[in-house]
Amino acid sequence: MAQITGDTHEWFQDWANDYDATLGKVSRHHDLLDTAVKASGIRQHDRVLDIGCGTGLLSLKFLGAADCRIKAIDSSARMLALFQEKIERYNLADRIQCIQEPAEDMECAPGEFDIIAATVSLHHVKEKAPVIRKIYDSLKEGGRFVLGDIDMDTTGRLDDPGRLKRILDYLARELELAMKEGGVQAFERMYDNGKKHILNDGEYCISFDQWAALCRNAGFPQVDIIPLQEYQWFKVLVAIK
């Protein structure tokens, strides 16, 4: 995950142990990951960077789609430890490299990757433009940046009732689905996470129009946005260098 506040970092460390049991069981999250992999146009032997890899859900889907090589980064040591267990269990050490590194501090060579992907992770980054520029520089010509996230604009004053209503319109659907698909455990996590979105406590979601503008400003000439069919407030952005 991206670099976040101390309290929020501890919250994600605590979440690591039941991450797969909550978010990993949410169907729309898997729909988002599957859409991101398909939209990436992954090919055999591509070099992939997975930003905010968590416990490896997206990376493993990339490997299921093509014989690629993955560098996976996350700021949470506990998330990476769980991912490393999967890597060892499935004998994937020659295909996946895990590094504890926040998105803001990631070190990549110019033109190193064919695909750079981030799902529900870059909204933790407060200053997004420098990270998007670094992503652009780290892609090969024709490389693809793939972003999957919720299309929710949380910018503005915390005491603005209009902003609060805008966020709650999204969160109400998320909370209902969390309870339906993951039970009380998933609901509690989503409820706690929702408060962080409202207070901008390590959560800084922006709209996909704002993401697209950041990508174009970084130099990407082509930017496309794909909404999930059943969950239109989740989208995948593909920016081609």
Task: Enumerate the predicted regions with their spans.
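Core SAM-dependent methyltransferase catalytic element
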Residues: A218-K241
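C-terminal alpha-helical "lid/dimerization" subdomain adjacent to the S-adenosyl-L-methionine
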Residues: I150-R216, D224-I225
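Conserved class I S-adenosyl-L-methionine
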Residues: M1-R43, L57-K61, L82, G194-K196
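Conserved beta-strand signature within the Rossmann-like core of class I S-adenosyl-L-methionine
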Residues: G143-D149
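A short glycine-rich, Lys/Arg-flanked "PGG" loop and its adjoining helix->strand segment in the class I
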Residues: P130-E141
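A short SAM/SAH-binding and catalytic strip from SAM-dependent methyltransferases
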Residues: D114-E127
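Class I SAM-dependent methyltransferase SAM/SAH-binding core
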Residues: L49-I51, T55-D105
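A short acidic, Gly/Pro-enriched loop at the edge of an enzyme's catalytic core
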Residues: E107-I115
